[in-house]
Amino acid sequence: SEWLDRGTTLTPELAWSDAFRMELDRLDELPNKAGGRASKEFPNKEDADFWNAKAPQWLADYVNWRNEMFDAGWSWLQVRGEDAIEVPVTATLFDVEVKGFIDRIMVSPDGEVHVVDIKTGSREPASLQLNVYQHLLEVVHDVHASHGAYYMARKGTTTEPKPLSISMETIARYFASAKKGIESEIYLPNVGMLCGTCGVRQPCSVFSE
């Protein structure tokens, strides 16, 4: 959807965005089955046929949502003279280098800054990622975001915006703990629904035995 926000007109020929191409390429690279649930329409779950069928509609829904937001008085934040779309942020938080890309940063009609992350999954993630983006945005660009939300592509809208209230110290401890585990070569499996499409399933101790 990035090229949509930078002024390219949506056409059937352009309905394949780079993001969905990456999803399809990733499916081919995975050593295991596609994720999601099997259905009458898509018996092979979320395989290439699923993404080919769903991506154009999701993109059209996104354009409608974005235009409705603009009509309601929302706007893109300006970062270094450009619309805040796919904003790269890299900073060191308590000796841990953290890199990311903030999908969208918007300004509400009353002037509050909101970070928005685009998700193609069906479940709303926890808010930790949005809080990390808040602190990275403040450190790198000296901009304070008060709220965050996820744009859920399957629903064509965002989750309810939430105040970003997790402290930098809490986030720093999270990354410091992860760094310590990596340096000690301690990798604890986090078994769950995402295991079916995990890119490191084969070497994982849960599935390799």
Give each language-model segment a name:
Residues 1, 104, 133, 148, ...:
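A residue-level signal for conserved active-site and pocket-lining positions in enzyme catalytic cores
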Residues 1-85:
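A non-catalytic, helix-rich entry segment at domain boundaries
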Residues 2-6, 135-140:
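Active-site catalytic microenvironments for nucleophilic, acid-base chemistry
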Residues 38-39, 111-115, 175-182:
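Short amphipathic alpha-helical segments and their helix-coil junctions
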Residues 46, 102, 196:
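Residue-level detector of short, conserved catalytic/binding motifs and their immediate flanks
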Residues 58, 129-133, 174-177:
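Alpha-helical scaffold elements adjacent to nucleotide-binding pockets in ATP/GTP-utilizing enzyme cores
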Residues 79, 84-135:
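Non-catalytic protein-protein interaction segments used by genome-maintenance enzymes to assemble
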Residues 94, 122-125, 137-209:
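Metal-dependent nuclease catalytic regions and adjoining charged, substrate-binding loops involved
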